A protein has these predicted regions:
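Active-site mouth loops of central-metabolism enzymes
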Residues: 27-40, 63, 89-101, 167-171
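Functional cores that coordinate and move charged inorganic groups
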Residues: 121, 129-164
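Divalent metal-dependent hydrolysis catalytic cores, especially in the metallo-beta-lactamase
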Residues: 44-67, 83-96, 110-124, 140-144, ...
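Active-site gating loops and adjacent loop-to-helix segments of metal-dependent hydrolytic enzymes
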Residues: 52-54, 75-87, 149-171
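Histidine-rich, glycine-flanked metal-binding segment
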Residues: 1-21
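Distinct, well-ordered alpha-helical segments
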Residues: 69-73, 98-107, 153-159
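Active-site-adjacent beta->alpha loops and helix N-cap segments on the catalytic face
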Residues: 66-76, 122-135
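Metal-associated gating/positioning segment near the N- to mid-region
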Residues: 15-83
Length: 171
């Protein structure tokens, strides 16, 4: 830019006519490790993220086994760190193994686990979700919810989303 002072020995890149953006964050990513590496794995996901300008990704837990434990989450994060192309946060399932009801594992998650989600499976039990929100508030967890009613979405997706939005607003 005008009046730019460049320290001796530093390079200057001419970015005239270009758009320069900071690194991006993908809050909803699927690397499919463990269990579905034939779809995507940590190495290919990391390479794709870095090539697209993403330096941080938030990984969904719809893996096999489902990422319901800190051990699985930490293993995925450690492998991403070893590869070293971008930072990765592995989310943990809201309900154990996506069973729609068991949430006791949330009570013992370590502090470095910050996000919980059922990914594409909304929790259909309002009482379970009320308890989840209470635990999340107490433990400092962020709930990423696919808020849709699966019984309605096959025939009216917008209505399915609206019902869940109203439900979540009243909790």
């Amino acid at each position: 830019g005008q009046g730019l002072v460049v320290p001796e020995g530093e390079d200057v890149l001419d970015a005239k006519g270009r758009t320069i953006l900071p690194a991006f964050i993908d809050t909803h990513c699927h690397w499919r490790t463990p269990g579905f590496e034939y779809k995507e794995d940590i190495a290919t996901g990391s390479a794709a993220a870095a090539a697209g300008g993403y330096t941080f990704v938030n990984l969904m837990p719809n893996t096999k086994p489902v990422c319901s434990t800190p051990e699985i989450a930490h293993a995925v994060e450690a492998e991403a760190k070893r590869i070293g192309l971008c930072d990765a946060n592995q989310t943990v399932s809201i309900t154990r193994d996506f069973d729609g009801k068991t949430i006791d594992h949330l009570l013992t998650l370590p502090e470095d686990i910050k996000f919980i989600t059922e990914d594409g499976n909304g929790v259909m039990n309002n009482a379970v979700m009320a308890r989840v929100f209470a635990i999340a508030t107490e433990r400092g967890l962020t709930v990423m919810s696919h808020a849709e009613d699966r019984e309605i979405s096959p025939w009216d997706y917008r209505l399915a989303e609206n019902i869940e939005t109203v439900r979540n607003c009243h909790l």
